[in-house]
């Protein structure tokens, strides 16, 4: 349940660098501001449960699962692992050894950013009550 969950809020301690990298990937791949994904649907933002409300929310669910899988390999912490990538709008390229922690995390973020850019954004799914809609 990471999808942009810790990005950009005011008056909070500095956040893990890879979340800043994820924010930058989102900006590279699409036109929507990253903050639009912070509290969207059942899976974008902190936590995640229930059935995704739409295609965009499924992107966040997939990203959560991708991070979960990355953590299963060695001592990989996707929330703190930085990585190398290039952005040539709207193209993103992950660098580093395939199968490494950094590359796996980068691939998760890249796939999510591309998915976000391709999915329709439904404003009515922003800020929904997760307790009632995400069971």
From Swiss-Prot:
What's any one GO cellular component for it?
extracellular region
InterPro entries in the record: PLipase_A2 (IPR001211), PLipase_A2_Asp_AS (IPR033112), PLipase_A2_dom (IPR016090), PLipase_A2_dom_sf (IPR036444), PLipase_A2_His_AS (IPR033113)
Cellular location(s): Secreted
Q: Name one GO molecular function term.
A: toxin activity
Query: What does the entry state regarding organ or tissue expression?
Result: Expressed by the venom gland.
Q: What is its main location?
A: secreted
Q: How is the cofactor bound?
A: Binds 1 Ca(2+) ion.
UniProt name for this protein? Basic phospholipase A2 10
Q: Which organism is it from?
A: Bungarus fasciatus (Banded krait)
Q: What is the lineage of its organism?
A: Eukaryota, Metazoa, Chordata, Craniata, Vertebrata
């Amino acid at each position: 349940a990471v999808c942009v969950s810790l990005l950009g809020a005011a008056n909070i301690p500095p956040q893990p660098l890879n979340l800043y990298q994820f924010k930058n990937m989102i900006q590279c791949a699409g036109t929507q501001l990253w903050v639009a994904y912070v509290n969207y649907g059942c899976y974008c933002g902190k936590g995640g449960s229930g059935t995704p409300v739409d295609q965009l929310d499924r992107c966040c669910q997939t990203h959560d699962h991708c991070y979960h899988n990355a953590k299963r390999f060695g001592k990989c912490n996707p929330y703190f692992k930085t990585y190398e990538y290039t952005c040539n709008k709207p193209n993103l390229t992950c660098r580093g050894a395939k199968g490494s922690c950094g590359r796996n995390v980068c691939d998760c973020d890249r796939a999510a950013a591309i998915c976000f850019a391709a999915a329709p954004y439904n404003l009515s799914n922003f800020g929904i009550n997760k307790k009632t809609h995400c069971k």
